């Protein structure tokens, strides 16, 4: 199984179960920016406990590793759980939607795209991908997040609402990171 096969399968599974979701993280940043290798899919989802059995049927233990108790705990505590495809080494990080202004806003700004022939996918807006990548950089200082952001700004820069990014960077205490990224972009040109 290839990454985009798993994206397609995940999307079809979630949509069949009526799970609200959007793809974010590296898969989204690659869509808006430059290609790079990734073996994981980040998806934010609104999953109810009543949907767990259906979810597990779509990801049977013969092919996937999904721990039911971890799923249940993630839903109750608004955390994340993994779906792993051991044969390919691919992993899905399912991040349970939090009830806060930013997550609520992200769900309102979902883009519906067709990156895979014959499949429509809900994907995070580029601005929200940038904001989350800044947040992850602040938490762990991995340069890949900065590279992803600069790539997105170079490729999709004209279509990115920088005012929106600035507003949330201010609210989420990411202003200094955003300013440093903008200075880096200007010095690269």
Regions of interest found by a model, annotated:
Residues 1-189:
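Compositionally biased terminal segments of proteins
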């Amino acid at each position: 199984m290839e990454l985009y096969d798993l994206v397609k399968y995940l999307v079809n599974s979630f949509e069949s179960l009526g799970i609200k979701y959007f793809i974010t993280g590296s898969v989204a940043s690659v869509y808006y920016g430059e290609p790079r290798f990734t073996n994981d899919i980040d998806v934010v989802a609104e999953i109810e406990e009543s949907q767990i059995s259906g979810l597990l049927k779509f990801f049977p233990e013969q092919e996937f590793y999904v721990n039911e108790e971890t799923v249940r705990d993630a839903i109750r505590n608004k955390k994340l759980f993994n779906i792993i495809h051991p044969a390919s080494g691919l992993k899905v990080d399912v991040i349970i939607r939090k009830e806060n202004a930013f997550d609520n806003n992200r769900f309102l700004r979902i883009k519906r795209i067709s990156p895979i022939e014959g499949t429509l996918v809900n994907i995070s807006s580029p601005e929200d991908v940038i904001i989350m990548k800044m947040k992850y950089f602040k938490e762990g200082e991995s340069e890949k997040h900065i590279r992803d952001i600069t790539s997105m700004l170079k490729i999709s820069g004209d279509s990115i609402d920088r005012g929106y990014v600035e507003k949330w960077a201010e609210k989420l205490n990411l202003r200094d990171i955003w300013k440093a990224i903008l200075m880096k972009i200007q010095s690269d040109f």
